[in-house]
Amino acid sequence: MVVPLQLQVPVTREGLRQAAEALRDWLAAAGLEGDAAYGAELGLEELGSNLLRHASPEGAATQLQIEARHSGALLELELIDNGAPFDPTTAALPNLHRPIQERPIGGLGLLLMRRMAAQLQYERLTDGNRLVCRFRAKARAAPPG
């Protein structure tokens, strides 16, 4: 079993860059690759960019807590922020049937995240948001010998 990744970063471009790098390193050390690893990276990137983009002085998130765990065939990414309520499991998705030039920008990351995750679970906390993303994971095969 791989030791879980636990870190807390400020909601800044640099903080999110450091979190993404730490997650990539942890995924590689855990031998995780493919859709689960990509989904976890996408989940962190999507939530982080939404926190940056939609941050307003009132209710803006300032901290993001990240925990990643791997057990058996499951990769779990837990993201907790101290911002205003935002439930990515119910947020409106883009209408893919409209011509691209008529679609508003945004929402495709959430769409991909919902499609890649085996389960997304949102909870509003007293002072923030908690999102748990679960992915079906396959570890890299160990080299023979």
Regions found by a protein language model. Name each.
Residues 63-73:
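Short beta-strand/loop element within the Bergerat-fold HATPase_c
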Residues 21-45, 102-104:
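Conserved short strand/loop->alpha-helix "switch" segment adjacent to the catalytic nucleotide/phosphoryl-transfer site
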Residues 77-105:
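Glycine-rich/acidic phosphate-handling loop/turn and adjacent ATP-lid/helix
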Residues 102-117:
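Glycine-rich phosphate-binding loop
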Residues 50, 54:
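Conserved N-box asparagine in the HATPase_c
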Residues 55-60:
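A short, flexible helix-to-loop-to-beta junction within the catalytic ATP-binding CA
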Residues 1-8, 114-145:
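Flexible, glycine-/charge-rich segments associated with ATP-binding catalytic modules
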